[in-house]
């Protein structure tokens, strides 16, 4: 019996895989989770927080997609979780896009839908610009392009706390960051804090390399504003009204620029829409993917 027959069996451990990739000068061992066996594949790309991973970011969203008949691949970006460490001196968005291309080539996937949260959204747009024929649909939450906000001074409150946590990875700093990460921090449990802290501290090399990367290049995420018109894939842009990491005007920039994009804004929602409003998010994503089915 495979995972698509028995979604309850899905877990981080049961779906854990590794792939060696070579994409140009980039040679890396990447970790990913591979769930289900549908004809269409949805790739999920996580954000840049300390201790982040594909599974930690999207564990509330995998089972509904698999149950609906999709194969789901969650890539741990270079420098996170069980993937190889790296110091990034250029565009982190483009590094992750190259890594994704290498992973898709390694596991024999051509065209995919991509869901990207925060950094994952930036990376999804970078991938779509470099590989337009390999993208079905895009779902972007709290990310898609770097660049300044017209709403709030940069860096934002959340990004300052995130960078502080990388430099001083303590449970106190983690709680400070998570308190502004979501709209309602009362939903965060001590178990969640501890799991995230354990993930962070298990890979001190990733934390140190992120700080080194920022010192070399403080602008890790490319501003794709001038090129958004080239992203013609159907795109669903999702934002939290109360996002204190990436302000809502970034979502407006995306739909102004991308010709086939639509925007949904969740009230009472921070930077983690797929977790904070998981049920509504899952229904919305499935509805969007099933419009004009067979686009792959």
Swiss-Prot record:
Pathway(s) this gene product operates in, as recorded in its UniProt entry: Aromatic compound metabolism; 3-phenylpropanoate degradation
The keyword Cell membrane appears for this protein: no
Catalyzed reactions per annotation: (2Z,4E)-2-hydroxy-6-oxonona-2,4-dienedioate + H2O = (2Z)-2-hydroxypenta-2,4-dienoate + succinate + H(+); (2Z,4E,7E)-2-hydroxy-6-oxonona-2,4,7-trienedioate + H2O = (2Z)-2-hydroxypenta-2,4-dienoate + fumarate + H(+)
Top-level lineage group: Bacteria
InterPro entries: AB_hydrolase_1 (IPR000073), AB_hydrolase_fold (IPR029058), Epox_hydrolase-like (IPR000639), MhpC_alpha/beta_hydrolase (IPR023791)
UniProt keywords, alphabetically: Aromatic hydrocarbons catabolism, Hydrolase
Active-site annotation: 271 (proton acceptor)
EC number in record: 3.7.1.14
GO biological process per UniProt: 3-phenylpropionate catabolic process
Site (Transition state stabilizer): 118
Ranges annotated as spanning the membrane: none
Gene3D superfamilies for the chain: alpha/beta hydrolase (3.40.50.1820)
Annotated ranges, domain AB hydrolase-1: 41-277
Coiled coil regions in record: none
Site (Catalytic role in ketonization of the dienol substrate (substrate destabilization)): residue numbering on this chain: 196
A cellular component term, taken from the record's GO annotations: cytoplasm
An example Gene Ontology molecular-function term: 2-hydroxy-6-oxonona-2,4-dienedioate hydrolase activity
Function: Catalyzes the cleavage of the C5-C6 bond of 2-hydroxy-6-oxononadienedioate and 2-hydroxy-6-oxononatrienedioate, a dienol ring fission product of the bacterial meta-cleavage pathway for degradation of phenylpropionic acid.
Family: Belongs to the AB hydrolase superfamily. MhpC family.
Quaternary structure note: Homodimer.
PANTHER family named in the record: ALPHA_BETA-HYDROLASES SUPERFAMILY PROTEIN, HYDROLASE
Protein name: 2-hydroxy-6-oxononadienedioate/2-hydroxy-6-oxononatrienedioate hydrolase 2
Gene designation: mhpC2
């Amino acid at each position: 019996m495979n995972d698509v027959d028995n979604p309850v069996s899905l877990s981080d451990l049961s779906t854990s895989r590794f792939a060696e990739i070579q994409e140009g000068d980039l040679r890396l061992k990447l970790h990913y989770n591979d769930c289900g066996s549908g004809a269409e594949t949805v790739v999920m790309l996580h954000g840049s927080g300390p201790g982040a991973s594909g599974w930690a970011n999207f564990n509330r969203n995998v089972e509904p997609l698999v149950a609906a008949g999709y194969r789901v691949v969650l890539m741990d970006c270079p420098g996170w979780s069980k993937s190889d460490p790296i110091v990034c001196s250029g565009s982190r968005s483009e590094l992750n896009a190259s890594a994704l291309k290498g992973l898709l080539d390694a596991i024999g996937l051509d065209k995919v839908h991509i869901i990207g949260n925060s950094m994952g959204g930036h990376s999804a747009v970078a991938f779509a610009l470099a590989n337009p024929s390999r993208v079905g649909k895009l779902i972007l939450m709290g990310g898609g392009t770097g660049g300044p906000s017209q709403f709030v001074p940069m860096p934002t409150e959340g990004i300052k706390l995130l960078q502080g946590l990388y430099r001083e990875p303590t449970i106190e700093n983690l709680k400070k960051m998570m308190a502004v990460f979501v709209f309602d921090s009362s939903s965060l449990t001590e178990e969640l804090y501890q799991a995230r802290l354990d993930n962070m501290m298990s890979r001190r090399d990733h934390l140190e390399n992120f700080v080194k990367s920022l010192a070399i290049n403080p602008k890790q995420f490319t501003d794709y504003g001038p090129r958004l018109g080239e992203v013609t894939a159907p795109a669903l842009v999702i934002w939290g009204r109360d996002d204190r990491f990436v302000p809502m005007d970034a979502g407006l920039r995306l739909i102004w620029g991308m010709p086939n994009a639509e925007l949904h804004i969740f009230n009472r929602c921070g930077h983690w829409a797929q977790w904070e409003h998981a049920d509504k998010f899952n229904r919305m994503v499935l509805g969007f993917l099933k419009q004009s089915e067979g686009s792959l």
